From Swiss-Prot:
Gene name of the record: L2
Protein induction: Expressed in the late phase of the viral replicative cycle.
Annotated organism of origin: Human adenovirus C serotype 5 (HAdV-5)
Protein name, as recorded: Penton protein
One cellular component term from this protein's GO annotations in UniProt: host cell nucleus
Alphabetized HAMAP family for the sequence: ADV_CAPSP
Entry remark concerning the domains of this protein: The cell attachment RGD motif is exposed at the virion surface and is involved in binding to the integrin heterodimer ITGAV-ITGB5.
GO molecular function, one term: structural molecule activity
Keywords from the named record: Capsid protein, Clathrin-mediated endocytosis of virus by host, Host nucleus, Host-virus interaction, Late protein, T=25 icosahedral capsid protein, Viral attachment to host cell, Viral penetration into host cytoplasm, Virion, Virus endocytosis by host, Virus entry into host cell
InterPro entries on file: Adeno_Penton_B (IPR002605)
């Protein structure tokens, strides 16, 4: 039995001194100073990543290699017995493929991974959805607006206006950005036809409109009017137009993402835009072109015609003189076009200069024409359209309408206190803001330390996350407005343009950059996840959205798990 080395009392010696003194003590033969052997380390700890990699299936010998586990959502053997009440986002599937087990028999089988090792699985998933961009499930088919619902006279010859918050619902479908805006406007008009028109509300009182134009183009700062007389029919960015007392509410709707209008603090509760918020965004009025052109007409048209007659006779005499000069041209051709030695001018050029000098000398003798007083043009705003719909001017002497535009308030209003201070103009997202989805494999993967084990679908531990495979696809169409006009006559989409005579209530133009929503299959590598050492023959796969709900729009869900040894089990 070897005794431990003995040292004198005091602090222990350093490691270097002990190692260097050991060979000397052994040479002297001291029984108490025997050489120190290195500590014994088991081979298992020398190779922590070796471990055991045996995989044992029921009734089969252990397999000393890795395998793969396939998670399929629509296996025919699982539908009738396991998934009759499930869907593609929450299903059960059998994972033992080496025997012809029925689903009932497979549920009693297990795949045992060597419990002397830590196991992990490389998880790869394939997810395909068929979700439309406007649907009730993702809160993209509804929005609220405050509109006028009653305009009734009172006993004292006044008008009582009544406003209410109304929820509008769009039909579900996969629409482009332009079509969605048309459907939102159509929902407001249909509510007016059903409620407002029956209670005395005028067509010019429709106080909520979604548009895409920049109503300030053509604005003259001197006159305060849009001088072309029409608003530029070009799409720039989705816009919200409101009349006094009106507003829109996107608190429980994601359609604001489609309009490209977001909050600067997106996690704050509520998203409501009212008329008072759009300070500085009043739409300028149009120039009354008919009145302007009528004021420029000259009443003395006949006098102008007489002057034109004298000009005509004068031109005839000039033609005769030109004909005589042309007859003499063959005779004087050489003389008139020859360059003299004392000047570079030809004889013809000198004659022309002499004629101009004579005309200038004779000009003072002519009687000066009497200048007629010019009429001052009439510049005034257009108050109504051809169908007598009012443009709602602020006052009779104002050049602005009561309509307020979010786009104008954002770009031309006060950036410190206006709508720009708490809203943000961003790129329109036709998907209305695609969310994330979570993968849960509660019977196969070990629960992460951030989750507790539960059997509720909404609280399953999350082992993987990815974005919902719905993307916004954009393409450029330079003839978008032309196509919109053609479709109005071929597809009879004039229902979206009920008030073509009114420049504000007219159908908004289609943007040249068209965006559509597209479902693209996604292949995601979730990395290596810790596996349980005992895997049941039937596994549950759950895919939940951001609100931890199963998603009915999942069309295909596949998962491939490749088990492998991570390390030896040390505890």
């Amino acid at each position: 039995m070897r005794r431990a080395a003995m040292y004198e009392e005091g602090p222990p010696p350093s490691y270097e001194s002990v190692v260097s003194a050991a060979p000397v003590a052994a040479a002297l033969g001291s029984p108490f100073d025997a050489p120190l052997d290195p500590p014994f380390v088991p081979p298992r700890y020398l190779r922590p990543t070796g471990g055991r990699n045996s995989i044992r299936y029921s009734e089969l010998a252990p397999l000393f290699d890795t395998t793969r586990v396939y998670l399929v959502d629509n296996k025919s053997t699982d539908v009738a017995s396991l998934n009759y009440q499930n869907d593609h986002s929450n299903f059960l599937t059998t994972v033992i493929q080496n025997n012809d087990y029925s689903p009932g028999e497979a549920s009693t089988q297990t795949i045992n991974l060597d419990d002397r090792s830590h196991w992990g699985g490389d998880l790869k998933t394939i997810l395909h959805t068929n979700m439309p961009n406007v649907n009730e499930f993702m809160f993209t088919n509804k929005f609220k607006a405050r509109v006028m619902v009653s305009r009734l006279p009172t006993k004292d010859n006044q008008v009582e206006l009544k406003y209410e918050w109304v929820e509008f619902t769009l039909p579900e479908g996969n629409y482009s950005e332009t079509m969605t805006i048309d459907l939102m406007n159509n929902a407001i008009v249909e509510h007016y036809l059903k409620v407002g028109r029956q209670n005395g509300v005028l067509e010019s009182d429709i106080g909520v409109k979604f548009d895409t134009r920049n109503f300030r183009l053509g604005f003259d700062p001197v006159t305060g009017l849009v001088m072309p007389g029409v608003y530029t029919n070009e799409a720039f960015h989705p816009d919200i137009i409101l009349l006094p007392g009106c507003g829109v509410d996107f608190t429980h709707s994601r359609l604001s993402n489609l309009l490209g209008i977001r909050k600067r603090q997106p996690f704050q509760e509520g998203f409501r835009i009212t008329y008072d918020d759009l300070e500085g965004g009043n739409i300028p009025a149009l120039l009354d072109v008919d009145a302007y052109q009528a004021s420029l007409k000259d009443d003395t048209e006949q006098g102008g015609g007489g002057a034109g007659g004298s000009n005509s006779s004068g031109s005839g005499a000039e033609e005769n003189s030109n004909a005589a000069a042309a007859a003499m041209q063959p005779v004087e051709d050489m003389n008139d076009h020859a360059i003299r030695g004392d000047t570079f001018a030809t004889r013809a050029e000198e004659k022309r200069a002499e004629a101009e000098a004579a005309a200038e000398a004779a000009a003072p003798a002519a009687q000066p024409e009497v200048e007629k007083p010019q009429k001052k043009p009439v510049i005034k705003p257009l108050t109504e359209d051809s169908k007598k719909r009012s443009y709602n001017l602020i006052s009779n002497d104002s050049t602005f309408t009561q309509y307020r535009s979010w786009y104008l308030a954002y770009n031309y209003g006060d950036p410190q206190t206006g709508i720009r201070s708490w809203t943000l103009l961003c790129t329109p997202d036709v998907t209305c803001g695609s969310e994330q989805v979570y993968w849960s494999l509660p019977d196969m993967m070990q629960d992460p330390v951030t989750f507790r084990s539960t059997r509720q679908i909404s609280n399953f531990p999350v082992v993987g996350a990815e974005l919902l495979p719905v993307h916004s696809k954009s393409f450029y169409n330079d003839q978008a407005v032309y196509s919109q006009l053609i479709r109005q006559f071929t597809s009879l989409t004039h229902v979206f343009n009920r008030f073509p005579e009114n420049q504000i209530l007219a159908r908004p133009p289609a943007p040249t950059i068209t965006t559509v929503s597209e479902n693209v299959p996604a292949l995601t590598d979730h990395g290596t996840l810790p596996l349980r050492n005992s895997i049941g023959g039937v596994q549950r796969v759950t895919i939940t959205d951001a609100r931890r709900r199963t998603c009915p729009y999942v069309y295909k869900a596949l998962g491939i798990v490749s088990p492998r040894v991570l390390s030896s089990r040390t505890f």
